[in-house]
């Protein structure tokens, strides 16, 4: 519960506790173009009216506290307070509501995702009057988004750097993720790149462990990249994970990558933190490095339907903080991701202007005002039989990443890479010829396997592998 706030000194100070809704529930409010808008899924405790719950969220995530304080009279709360301006029940759910909250732009530090999240979600999620709370979406106004650099380079600049157009990019996470020596790790990188992949990748928890220190890994991977480039005539890359225990150490690793002349580094943006990520993104733009982002820890935050933060919000935050790639689920693989929900936040990552579309979970129209886009990365439990669906779902502006689906090939790493490259080229050609990949995809793969023994072997190994579990987070 919270005060009805009077901001004029002549009124005088009246101590006490009053309902939040008397001050922070304002259904007559017309949102401003400069407001940050939030859509919260609110589950109040029994006996708490939805208007009070929505107002409590607005208050506790902006200027309010649990009781009237005399310093309220020293400022204009009408200028600075958050406002719950609309509440609607969630269809099919009992005692659950979407509360829309508007925040004045002056509440937030320019160019700081850290400050934005500290304000909007930093404290209110532990509020006792709420059984559960989930931040479903944010509208970031151009007046705020223009204070951010955003991705270091973006989709078009990356394609120009790599000289690769008209198809998704292909990647592979090196497995086993832990335990290889740096030299054996570099060998696997070389074999995959030589076989036809565009990128290989450090897994999210590959940092600098006793069995493989980061500098040794960087050196052997750089050697692998240059050797594969010389043999194939294509530009290659390996996502060198710069994530570290301190921001200073992270930057030291990024500097080493730049000195080695490699094209791309990597960061775990949630475990590493938004402040560190934004610093790294600025360095990458200034020094010509692409930045791959892994979302390790995201499911702790976003998987539960009633509590937490939806990934579309984390995706928007990443676009502002900075990254050229980010993992975005696969729809068809082993990791969580319902199709319409996934395509909704994929558009929020890639496009300049995204219309409100509740059928895909997009609560607000978002205008990025020419901020560079981010390539979504499909990774996790995918193999050659998934290639038609992945090509059809994600389109050209994506990275399709096969870890076990490359390194698990019965003939070795390079043949695994060949199989994936052949499958991708076949799917792109079939699509360009007007064939329906959703309906004819398996036939396209079978036809291509007649001319590629590597693809035929991969098709045989993974013909029975499926991950058919219902998504937890559905619209």
From Swiss-Prot:
An annotated Gene Ontology molecular function: monooxygenase activity
Binding site for substrate: 123, 173, 177, 295, 327, 379
Cofactor: Mg(2+)
Source species, domain of life: Eukaryota
Keywords per UniProt: Acetylation, Calvin cycle, Carbon dioxide fixation, Chloroplast, Lyase, Magnesium, Metal-binding, Methylation, Monooxygenase, Oxidoreductase, Photorespiration, Photosynthesis, Plastid
Protein name: Ribulose bisphosphate carboxylase large chain
A Pfam family assignment: RuBisCO_large
Residues the record lists as N6-carboxylysine modifications: 201
Principal EC category: lyase
Binding note for cofactor: Binds 1 Mg(2+) ion per subunit.
Primary localization: plastid
Gene3D superfamilies in alphabetical order: Ribulose bisphosphate carboxylase, large subunit, C-terminal domain, RuBisCO large subunit, N-terminal domain
Catalytic activity, EC: 4.1.1.39
Organism: Nymphaea alba
Residue stretch(es) of the prosequence: 1-2
